[in-house]
UniProtKB/Swiss-Prot annotation:
One of its GO terms (biological process) is isopentenyl diphosphate biosynthetic process, methylerythritol 4-phosphate pathway. This is 2-C-methyl-D-erythritol 4-phosphate cytidylyltransferase. The record marks 25, 32 as: Transition state stabilizer. The lineage of its organism: Bacteria, Pseudomonadati, Pseudomonadota, Gammaproteobacteria, Moraxellales. It catalyses: 2-C-methyl-D-erythritol 4-phosphate + CTP + H(+) = 4-CDP-2-C-methyl-D-erythritol + diphosphate. Belongs to the IspD/TarI cytidylyltransferase family. IspD subfamily.
Length: 238
């Protein structure tokens, strides 16, 4: 596969990592992005993966009281920028985009990636960015839904089986141009829309978003036992 370095000589590529969340399924004292896998935190593994791309820089949106993030040994630490996160993920992303808009061009590309997805592969990252740049279109990593889906009522009884034929499970990174994504999120928030990822904001302003085939091992660490799974995945990938 052709790699990106020659394609991005004019195109600047940035990354945003929202990392202000408390991770409600971990105990209050334990932020999931700061759990250790082997000798590095989850977020250090995540940044290391993203840094395989020719990034101009990356922005970590962290909690206001977070004094830990800046002490970590991030890959290419000279490219690291920090900003305050927000109440929810979408606000953290918008804060990071506002920060970026002071140092980047609105036509630069930005990847938004979950802090707790340390297992994304270079092949997936490379394909995603290449597709976005070549088609000049926003894109996300996603995988087709493979399990049978059930719609249930409030009593946890099955109402019906949902066809999975056209359903894909969204992952991150999700890539768009800085100016377009910023406008999409601002518009969605103004209209009180529920924004669960960047694509949902882009969809709400009629922006086309393509799906790029991801991998099922690009897991998001959500529960404490996901840490062991992530450790095994990282081990097998290396």
């Amino acid at each position: 596969m052709r790699h990106l370095h020659h394609q991005t000589s004019q195109t600047k590529l940035w990354a945003v990592i929202p990392a202000a969340g408390s991770g409600s399924r971990f105990s209050k004292t334990e932020l999931k992005q700061y759990q250790y896998i082997q000798d590095a935190t989850v977020i250090e593994h995540t940044v290391k993966r993203l840094s395989q791309l020719p990034l101009t820089g990356y922005v970590l949106a962290i909690g206001k009281q977070d004094t830990f993030a800046s002490t970590l040994s991030f890959q290419d630490k000279h490219k690291a920028h920090f900003c305050n996160g927000g109440v929810e993920r979408v606000h953290s992303v918008l804060n990071a985009l506002n920060y970026l808009s002071q140092i980047a061009d609105e036509d630069d590309w930005v990847l938004v990636h979950d802090a707790a997805r340390p297992c994304v592969t270079f092949e997936c990252l490379n394909t995603l960015v290449k597709n976005a740049i070549e088609t000049n279109q926003s894109a996300i990593l996603a995988i087709p839904v493979r399990d049978t889906l059930k719609q249930v009522n409030q009593e946890q009884q099955i109402d019906k089986t949902v066809s999975r034929e056209l359903l894909w499970q969204a992952q991150t990174p999700q890539i768009a141009k800085i100016g377009i994504l910023k406008k999409a999120i601002e518009t969605a928030l103004k209209n009180n829309l529920t924004i669960t990822d960047e694509a949902s904001a882009l969809e709400s302003i009629g922006e086309s978003v393509q799906v790029v085939m991801g991998r099922s091992d690009n897991i998001k660490i959500t529960y404490p036992d996901d840490l062991e799974l992530a450790r095994l995945i990282l081990q097998s990938q290396n």
